[in-house]
């Protein structure tokens, strides 16, 4: 789920958790209305950290696991498996406030999955993580997905969304402006993008009909054009000038689609 700040992502998540009632309609999971009594099947990683800073990691995870209906004897092995996976076994007896922001985020993620939820909601899960730890978390999300967990998450990292998601919803002021399978959304996006690289100047191309954007880049240009017919015209024009190192028609990136549908002010 994507959207600018204030678009309604967190509000939607709170409705999915049964914390807020929709103004109209209802939230359902597997055909049944979601209310507070069904939240044991849901895991939630909030954008704002909600851990108790004075509690030790072990006590924190046992407490939250018990709230989800688990027995302590089941929590301990699950907790230690995740601590080992995230390379934080040494922190089991440390207080939350003694951990770095990145390691706090790992513990909060463990808290959201320790009860093996059917539905996992992740609100900006990669916040505060360096590239190495972001990769660890991403691999964990992929593994959970393979095991059958349904995952809904929001992120401002378009590369993570493209890599992890099958379906996409872009919100604007609480209303979906794009929704569907990510592959189909990209395929149906009318605008095309052309990357041209070479030693010559390509300034004259920006005046051709159908060219919507002209962007200088290292060693060449990137153009946004109305459709493939315009791309053919540009190819013919470029071919007249002789050698071109690269001419490629690209699929729109998620960043391109987001800017088109939500606006440059929010990108």
Swiss-Prot record:
ATP binds at residues 3-10. PROSITE patterns: ABC_TRANSPORTER_1, ABC_TRANSPORTER_2. Signal peptide: none annotated. The keyword Cytoplasm does not apply. It comes from the Bacteria. InterPro entries: ABC_transporter-like_ATP-bd, ABC_transporter-like_CS, ABC_transporter_ATP-binding, DrrA1-3-like_C, P-loop_NTPase. One of its GO terms (molecular function) is ATP hydrolysis activity. Residues 2-198 form the ABC transporter domain. Coiled coil: none annotated. Keywords: ATP-binding, Nucleotide-binding, Transport. Belongs to the ABC transporter superfamily. This is Uncharacterized ABC transporter ATP-binding protein BpOF4_11395. It comes from Alkalihalophilus pseudofirmus (strain ATCC BAA-2126 / JCM 17055 / OF4) (Bacillus pseudofirmus).
């Amino acid at each position: 789920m994507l959207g600018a700040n204030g678009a309604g992502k967190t509000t939607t998540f709170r409705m999915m958790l049964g914390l807020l009632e929709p103004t109209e309609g209802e939230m359902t999971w597997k055909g049944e209305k979601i209310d507070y009594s069904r939240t044991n099947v849901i895991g939630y990683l909030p954008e704002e950290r909600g851990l108790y800073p004075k509690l030790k990691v072990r006590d924190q995870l046992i407490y939250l696991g018990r709230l989800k209906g688990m027995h302590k004897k089941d929590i301990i092995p699950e907790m230690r498996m995740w601590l080992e996976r995230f390379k934080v076994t040494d922190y089991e007896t440390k207080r939350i406030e003694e951990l770095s922001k990145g390691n706090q985020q790992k513990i909060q993620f463990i808290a959201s999955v320790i009860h093996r939820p059917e539905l996992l909601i992740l609100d900006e899960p990669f916040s505060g993580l360096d590239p190495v730890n972001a990769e660890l978390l991403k691999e964990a999300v992929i593994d959970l997905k393979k095991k059958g967990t349904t995952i809904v998450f929001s992120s401002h990292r378009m590369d993570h969304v493209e890599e992890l998601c099958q379906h996409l919803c872009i919100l604007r002021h609480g209303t979906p402006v794009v929704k569907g399978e990510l592959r189909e959304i990209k395929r149906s996006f009318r605008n095309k993008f052309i990357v041209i690289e070479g030693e010559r100047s390509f300034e004259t191309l920006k005046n051709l009909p159908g060219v919507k954007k002209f962007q200088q880049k290292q060693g060449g240009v990137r153009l946004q054009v109305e459709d493939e017919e315009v791309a053919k015209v540009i190819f013919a024009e470029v071919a007249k000038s002789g050698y071109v190192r690269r001419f490629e028609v690209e699929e729109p990136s998620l960043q391109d689609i987001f800017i088109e549908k939500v606006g440059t002010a929010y990108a």
